[in-house]
Amino acid sequence: MSDEKYNAKLDQAGGKLKEGFGKISGDKSLETEGKVDKVTGKVKEVIVDAKDTVKGLAKGLDNKDK
């Protein structure tokens, strides 16, 4: 797993924790912040996956030309 993907997963996990603590404590602001962190982490993960796919396609096309 790349560092970028690992960090995206950490963002998602941290967001889940914040959201949970926000729910338990009744802190809507913390809960919302956690939800935002989760979504941000997921978006980062999707971007990393897309970059990996493009790199793989480019590499495949490179090998096809040889």
Curated annotation (Swiss-Prot):
Family assignment from sequence similarity: Belongs to the UPF0337 (CsbD) family.
InterPro entries in UniProt: CsbD, YjbJ_sf
Protein name: UPF0337 protein spyM18_1212
UniProt organism field: Streptococcus pyogenes serotype M18 (strain MGAS8232)
